[in-house]
Amino acid sequence: LRSLVGSEMCIRDRAYKGTNDLGAIVPIKSEDLVMATCYTEAEQIAYKLAKGKDEFGDVDIEIVRTKISEVAYNDTFATDTELICGLISYFFEESEDTEVGLYQVSLVYYDVDEKTGKTKSSNSTIYVPAYSSSEAIENIRTYLKRAGETREYTIRNVKYDKAQSVMVTPETHQNNIRV
């Protein structure tokens, strides 16, 4: 598990019409997290991802600035190294009918103030790819141990996130795959 930290924008609710396995025209939605420093970069990536998806109508795109402090990388992600606007895509190969995906894990850290001796708490959210919510908890514990986290913490909430991919710079990807 490695951390992806940076400025992220979220391309939420990219909606278009496509065909299902039976050939019927159906609405399709997808969400992607992209490392972008500004709205213009995210918009450029969104339009690149939408290219060719307008066969049955317009593509609706909503871009939301999302501050994501950490995404823990692991081999649950499949990787597409073909660059899209200079970014590598991490995605999930499993169908949407499974629990495989990105999970938001909310943590509360407990710190002891050295001057007063009182315990202070701070909140954090880490996104982690996993096959299930219980595996997300295991992955977070492993990630924090490898990161050298020494503070006590409590996992408060584990929530499935609808993002279907995470797009990162080649440099971030190289840092993630180093053993």
What are these regions (language model features)?
Residues 1-11:
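Single conserved hydrophobic/aromatic residue that forms the stacking wall/gate
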Residues 7, 24-25, 48, 52-111, ...:
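Intrinsic disorder/low-complexity detector
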Residues 13-19, 107-111:
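Generic short beta-strand segments
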Residues 18-38, 43-44, 52-56, 118-126, ...:
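A cross-kingdom feature marking solvent-exposed beta-strand/loop segments within repeated
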Residues 42-50, 136-141:
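Short amphipathic, charge-patterned alpha-helical segments
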Residues 87-137, 141-143:
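Surface-exposed interaction/gating patches
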Residues 126-127, 131-167:
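A generic hydrophobic-segment detector
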